[in-house]
């Protein structure tokens, strides 16, 4: 419950709000007679929807979503609800992580929190048909493992799961067994290279440390970065200060689809790109000042580099942006009348150039296409 109010003009009428919508009664005084008070939902056909993760494959479903409270959905048709409903086997309340094997597109893995009473269910599940049907993993790393984020090797051969406030765990047998990844701190987000199944990456943007693995995630090595933008990096005595919203897409590392070791660091206060084949050498993109969300989409016809989408501040202006030339130039794709409140996630459609998905905090997933 977030709030409760009694109508100042009608003592029988009261309302309270929850994440599931508003409720109201018109017989509040029944409680004084020790009789039941009848409450009814005020929403009709709508519900607060909070996307927690967006994953757009190159084939099959257009989008696979991780949702707060309702698990998530596989969106084959963007114009109508999928007949399969929310993801099952098991049903999650929250799906905090969902991703797939980039070179084996039918394999998708999700992690989250169980919904309701499912005593034998696990908090990780996978699909081998692009998100239509799901199989629970046989085990989880520890009995407390839930939520967090999942990374899947490009060929699906290994998965790395970092549950909430936990070490990173590796499985090579679809969750039948797990081992601790060596060389990683707790509670760090890991991603997979989109081409080389042996490569995984993680970044601590505040400490300026890049972690990389070349053995399929078993061992990580740390490299010190030199990120040149340092606004709002640390507070007194070196304590980390708040950098945007931890649920958003900032202070994360991203791997470019179709390109090995082509990495982006979307720091809260700057965008960095590294394409050096021998070592990690990140250069700053000067126009980007603040980042809240970052993602890729299908390349513009005639281009061989994916479109890049970003929510943040570029050249002093907040907005949703797309770049068709590897972040050298940007076009704003929204206007001041379409900002949708708190927005923490963005990704492009990998099957249709220009289509973009916006993850709002309570207003669902917004999709848009170029006006012309």
Question: Could you describe each region identified by the protein language model?
Answer:
Residues 1, 43-44, 141, 225-244, ...:
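Surface-exposed loop and turn segments in beta-propeller and other repeat-based domains
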Residues 1-9, 52-59, 96-106, 148-155, ...:
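Structural signature of eukaryotic scaffold interfaces centered on beta-propeller domains
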Residues 2-13, 17-22, 53, 249-275, ...:
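Loop/turn-rich, solvent-exposed surfaces of beta-rich toroidal or solenoidal domains
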Residues 21-23, 71, 114-118, 166-167, ...:
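Short glycine/acidic-enriched loop and turn motifs that connect beta-strands
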Residues 25-27, 72-76, 125-134, 153, ...:
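Conserved Ser/Thr-centered positions that define the repeating blades of beta-propeller domains
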Residues 34-43, 83-87, 135-139, 179-183, ...:
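Beta-propeller fold detector
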Residues 38-54, 89-96, 229-233, 286-295, ...:
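Conserved blade-ending motifs and adjacent loop-strand segments that build the rim/top face
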Residues 338-372:
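Blade-level signature of beta-propeller repeat domains, shared across WD40, Kelch, NHL, RCC1
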């Amino acid at each position: 419950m977030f709030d409760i109010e009694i109508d100042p003009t009608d003592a029988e009428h009261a309302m309270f709000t929850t994440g599931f919508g508003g409720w109201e009664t018109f017989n509040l005084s029944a409680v004084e007679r020790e009789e039941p008070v009848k409450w009814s939902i005020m929403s009709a056909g709508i519900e607060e929807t909070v996307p927690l993760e967006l994953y757009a494959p190159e084939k099959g479903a257009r989008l696979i979503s991780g949702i707060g409270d309702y698990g998530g959905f596989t969106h084959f048709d963007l114009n109508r609800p999928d007949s399969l409903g929310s993801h099952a086997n098991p049903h999650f309340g929250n799906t905090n992580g969902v991703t797939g094997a980039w070179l084996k597109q039918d394999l998708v893995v999700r992690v989250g929190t169980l919904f309701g009473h499912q005593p034998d269910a696990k908090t990780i599940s996978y699909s081998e048909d692009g998100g239509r049907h799901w199989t629970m993993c046989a085990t989880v790393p520890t009995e407390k493992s839930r939520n967090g984020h999942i990374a899947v090797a490009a060929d699906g051969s290994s998965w790395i799961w970092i549950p909430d406030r936990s070490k990173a765990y590796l499985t090579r047998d679809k969750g039948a067994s797990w081992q601790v990844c060596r060389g990683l701190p707790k509670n760090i987000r890991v991603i997979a290279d989109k081409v080389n199944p042996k490569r995984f990456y993680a970044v601590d943007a505040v400490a300026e440390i890049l972690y990389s693995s070349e053995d399929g995630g078993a061992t990580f090595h740390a490299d010190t970065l030199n990120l040149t933008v340092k606004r709002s990096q640390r507070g007194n005595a070196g304590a980390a200060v708040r950098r945007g919203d931890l649920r958003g897409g900032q202070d994360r590392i991203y791997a470019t689809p179709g390109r090995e070791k082509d990495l982006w660091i979307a720091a809260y206060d700057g965008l960095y790109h590294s394409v050096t084949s021998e070592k990690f050498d990140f250069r700053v993109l000067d126009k980007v000042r603040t980042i809240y969300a970052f993602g890729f989409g299908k390349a513009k016809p005639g281009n061989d580099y994916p479109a890049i989408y970003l929510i943040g501040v570029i050249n002093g202006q907040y907005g949703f942006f797309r770049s068709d030339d590897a972040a050298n130039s940007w076009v704003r794709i929204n206007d001041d009348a379409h900002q949708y409140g708190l927005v923490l996630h963005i990704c492009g459609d990998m099957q249709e150039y220009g289509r973009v998905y916006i993850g709002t905090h309570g207003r669902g997933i917004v999709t848009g296409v170029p006006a012309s």
